[in-house]
Amino acid sequence: MENVVFIGKEIRRELKRQGRSGVWLARQLPCSNNHVYKLFSKKTMDTDLLWRISDIMDVNFFRLYMDKWERRRRIIQNG
């Protein structure tokens, strides 16, 4: 079972679902468009930045990690 959350891909997917762009996110953060597009290719991210993005987009991206952790714990407990 894969236990990795590819956070950049998840953020890009959610932006698309919300009908928003990387340019929009760059304005909200604020940072360069280039920086945001580089974030999309990252598997990991600083927690402060992820917190800011979660707040801006009104999405708890930390839940992705918690869901993976809970599934892993269930597998371990159930043998």
Task: Please report, for each region that a protein language model flagged, where it lies by residue.
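Recognition helix of helix-turn-helix/homeodomain-like DNA-binding domains
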Residues: 30-44
